[in-house]
A protein has these predicted regions:
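Acidic, metal/ion-coordinating pockets
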Residues: 1-359
Length: 359
């Protein structure tokens, strides 16, 4: 049994425009066409869906840090071989609660599964799949939801909407003119290469923050609950820095408590670069898989950190346990039409520095 995991899936404005034909119809399949054979080689594929499908009326992606992608991305991912999308990430409320709910609806409409966000408190906050008698539980959690910038705070009584490892950050209260100016600047300004490296998006002081303990306890209870129902528990964790070269203290803290809490594997994303894959006790850890789909040099971008590469991770499962893994290196490049697409990398010299990051 082979279960594969992609890095973060984002669609930038240039990619969207490059996928519109002369009749105004969108087709995102060219972005994934060259990596489709790799995805087809797995029995089940999980993608990190770091955008929303909130609809045209909510406004499509136009800034570097706020995402909403046309619905046509979902059938393209299904066509490429993706089966399950993790939806707990810092962009899940980029278009508010309505956008998050519509995203789930569209995922289901297109024959895909999801985990990480929920429509109702009655829904399970993890997904269990039975693969020929081996039950695997998939959980997805995020460190936050960009609430400081998008201003969305989960209403009281709706904490089921997304799986969080800590409380949401308080929104920044700025005068209206500053908010408008900031939004306009994000649209017209070009990214500054090298200006956005962060070791962790959560301060190291929060490792000992008592406010987080309730969230962590609920997460660990969920892991134990899933462990009662499944043979293998896989945590898809959205946490970390940005373009960082090592795992930050807060995210390492999460790795520690999740592995000690009984998860069999942790699949990390969010860093927008690749980070080490290793065994931590009885838990397999992939710290960060990188960018599976995005536009190099566009939006929030840093040079010199191999951000255009990602690791397509495949876990091999036999006898109801993880028995090994394989990594295929992928790269986001621009084709002859200027469209940023994802391709497999087969050149050993090019692969070597990425493999070094994964050690």
């Amino acid at each position: 049994m082979k279960i594969a995991f992609t890095g973060d899936i984002l669609i930038y404005e240039s990619q969207d425009k490059g996928c519109i034909d002369k009749n105004g119809k969108r087709d995102y399949r060219p972005i994934f066409e060259q990596v489709k054979p790799l995805l087809d080689g797995a029995d089940y594929v999980i993608g990190s869906f770091e955008t929303t499908a909130a609809g045209a009326e909510a406004g499509y992606t136009h800034a570097a840090t706020s995402f909403n992608t046309p619905d046509e991305l979902l059938p393209a991912l299904k066509w490429a071989g993706v089966d399950l999308l993790t939806t707990a990430n810092n962009h899940c409320f980029d278009r508010g609660e309505a956008g998050m709910r519509r995203t789930i609806d569209k995922i289901v409409e297109n024959g895909l599964e999801y985990t990480g966000t929920r429509l109702s408190g009655k829904d399970s906050n993890y997904l269990i799949k039975d693969f020929d008698g081996t039950k695997v539980a998939f959980l997805a959690y995020t460190y936050g939801t960009n609430s400081r910038s998008n201003g969305y705070i989960i209403p009281k009584g709706k904490d089921y909407l997304v799986n969080l490892t800590r409380p949401q950050d308080e929104p920044l209260h700025r005068p209206l003119w500053k908010r408008v100016a900031s939004k306009l600047l994000s649209i017209v300004s070009k990214p500054k290469a090298g200006s956005g490296i962060q070791e962790d998006c959560v301060n190291a002081m929060e490792v000992a923050n008592g406010r987080n303990e309730l969230y962590e306890a609920k997460m660990l209870d969920t892991i134990r609950e899933a462990k009662q129902e499944a043979d293998i528990v896989i945590m898809c964790l959205h946490s970390g820095g940005q373009f960082n070269s090592k795992v930050g203290a807060y995210t390492q803290h999460l790795f520690d408590i999740i592995s000690e809490g009984g998860a069999d594997a942790i699949i990390g994303n969010h860093a927008h670069t690749t980070l080490p894959i290793y065994q931590q006790g009885n838990c397999f850890v992939a710290s960060a898989l990188g960018n599976f789909s995005f536009a190099p040099g566009e939006g929030y971008w840093v040079d010199g950190v191999e951000a255009e590469y990602s690791a397509l991770l495949t876990l091999n499962i036999a006898d109801k346990t993880i028995v090994g893994h394989k990594v295929d290196i992928c790269k986001c490049v621009r084709n002859e039409m200027g469209l940023a697409i994802t391709v497999p990398v087969n050149n050993e010299q090019e692969i070597e520095p990425i493999n070094n990051r994964l050690k």
